[in-house]
Amino acid sequence: MFRPATRILLRAPGVAARGPVSRRLISTAPPDAKSRSWKSTIVRLGLAAGAVYYYNTSSVFAEQPSLSFLSKQSTPDSSDETQLPTIDSIKPRIREERQAESKAVSQPDAQPTQHEALSASEAALKSPQELEDEAGQEAAFNPETGEINWDCPCLGGMAHGPCGEEFKAAFSCFVYSTEEPKGMDCIDKFKGMQECFRRYPDVYGAELEDDDEADAAAATAAGVSEPSEQPASPTVSAPTAEIDASSDSEGKEGRAKDVHAQVKSEVAEKAEQAESDDLVPKAWHDTEGTKAQQTEK
């Protein structure tokens, strides 16, 4: 019933029977596994390529994570590189700022005096002819180009009004006149301009008032003055020479208007003086009357 152990050991085979061993590579599938089709291979390659593309282009992986050991290790290095300012490095900067403030306080007092000295010296060096040329350049007429700026504010916009053509003719005639005294050949054009002004009193009321005042002053001066043996030679002042070069543009525009009004009054006075020379003086009538009474007696 019980078999001895020695008998069992003798009956058991010493070496187990082994089948033939087949060799294969890691990449090759085992013989018991089914071979995959080419479609599954393409799908796997596509998924791998998509994962790589998403990893390279997505912003999720581009952001630095909030919890990172690399960021904690880099912060001590950056803090060591930055150096805090010391007292020795601040002292030179404080000295430079104080010196700059002291220079800024002293310079404004010296600059106005230098500017005033330069302006005074420039005004003293300029001759009356240079002052006249400068005034002409800033006024309506430019002697260098020989052109008239009809849009100049000093003309008061009269060149573009209803009498603009008459004003342009009279003003250009006076500017380009070569007669002595200047403007004697432009009397008729100035009279035509004044007649045009009288046709539009609403527009040229101020100019008409100036002309009336100039005519009244000329009439009173002609009535009071006695005729002399030699006719007085008319002189035309050069008002543009009186313009100060240091005045601003507004002052020069106002002076240009005064010059224009003065020229008109002088032309009117010359015309009335030429007419008064042909008239018989009042003293001659008185002497003739006394002579006639004496002859009758």
Curated annotation (Swiss-Prot):
Which GO BP terms sit in this record? protein import into mitochondrial intermembrane space
- GO molecular function terms here? protein-disulfide reductase activity
Topological domain (Mitochondrial matrix) residues are 26-44
Membrane-related topology note: Single-pass type II membrane protein
Give the transit peptide range: 1-25
Q: Which PANTHER family match?
A: COILED-COIL-HELIX-COILED-COIL-HELIX DOMAIN CONTAINING 4
- The intrachain disulfides are C152-C154, C163-C196, C173-C186
Would you tell me the protein name for this molecule?
Mitochondrial intermembrane space import and assembly protein 40
